[in-house]
């Protein structure tokens, strides 16, 4: 309806990076350029495992009611908060947690007397925060979508998909990411067979793609300014 036939660039990080990879696989003739950040071409066993524990946390909450909680007037707050805590632990790096929290107690609490460690208070905060604003079933479905992500399924595999892509593909990984490790991005670049993996340097783990704005901006600028393969370069001063 909009008459858009080709996209100058498709850019995404994390789950958005999965969607970007799917655009490349599903519409290779329409996507001129793509930037996949802190993501992958297919889910790994480790990602599926992290997601599974989150789904179980939600669906095991008695207030989930097999997903029919709205009709029953209930809400699986505890399950959703726990799922977020599990997820948030995977979003940050072990080194950041150690440097930021160590084994320090939560202010005003004593872990030896039933109180919390500081890192536990941090996770509790983020769990409660998400539970106030997110739908549990939507969380489950998004997590399941990530687990089943595989752009090579039904298309001859990851290598076949990316080797056939004629556009420009940039793939970037966060060097401290334990949810979408560097190896997942490396696999994509090897399948594409051209260029090199870009590295985002950050102590913040997977969330580095949200925090390191200057590095992301540099990647976006590189992508949108890059001429397509086969496109003549304009050289200043040459007629």
Language model feature labels by segment:
Residues 1-9, 18, 28:
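Conserved acidic catalytic loop of the alpha/beta-hydrolase fold
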Residues 9-11, 23, 34, 171:
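Conserved alpha/beta-hydrolase fold motif
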Residues 17-28, 34:
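Short glycine-enriched nucleophile-adjacent loop
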Residues 30-32, 36-129:
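Alpha/beta-hydrolase-fold enzymes
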Residues 125-126, 141-161:
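Active-site nucleophile elbow and catalytic-triad environment of alpha/beta-hydrolase enzymes
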Residues 154, 178-184:
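Conserved alpha/beta-hydrolase "acid-adjacent" motif
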Residues 165, 171-173, 177:
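Short beta-strand/loop motif that positions the catalytic acidic residue
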Residues 186-190, 194-239:
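Catalytic active-site module of serine/aspartate enzymes centered on a nucleophile-bearing elbow/loop
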């Amino acid at each position: 309806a909009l008459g858009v036939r080709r996209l100058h660039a498709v850019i995404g990080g994390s789950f958005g990076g999965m969607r970007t990879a799917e655009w490349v696989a599903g519409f290779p003739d329409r996507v001129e350029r793509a930037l996949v950040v802190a993501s992958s071409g297919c889910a790994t066993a480790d990602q599926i495992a992290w997601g599974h524990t989150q789904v179980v946390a939600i669906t095991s909450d008695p207030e989930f009611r097999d997903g029919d909680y709205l009709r029953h007037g209930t809400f699986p707050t505890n399950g959703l908060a726990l799922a977020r805590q599990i997820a948030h632990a995977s979003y940050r790096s072990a080194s950041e947690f150690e440097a930021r929290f160590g084994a320090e107690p939560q202010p005003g609490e004593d872990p030896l007397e039933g109180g919390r460690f500081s890192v536990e208070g941090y996770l509790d905060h983020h769990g409660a925060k998400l539970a106030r604003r997110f739908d549990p079933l939507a969380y489950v479905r998004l997590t399941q979508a990530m687990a089943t992500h595989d752009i090579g399924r039904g298309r001859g595999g990851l290598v076949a998909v990316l080797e056939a892509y004629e556009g420009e593909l940039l793939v970037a990984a966060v060097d401290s990411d334990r949810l979408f490790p560097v190896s997942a991005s490396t696999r994509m670049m090897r399948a594409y067979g051209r260029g090199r993996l870009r590295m985002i340097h950050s102590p913040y783990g997977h969330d580095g793609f949200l925090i390191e704005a200057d590095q992301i901006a540099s990647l976006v600028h590189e992508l949108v300014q890059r001429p397509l393969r086969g496109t003549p370069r304009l050289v200043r001063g040459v007629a």
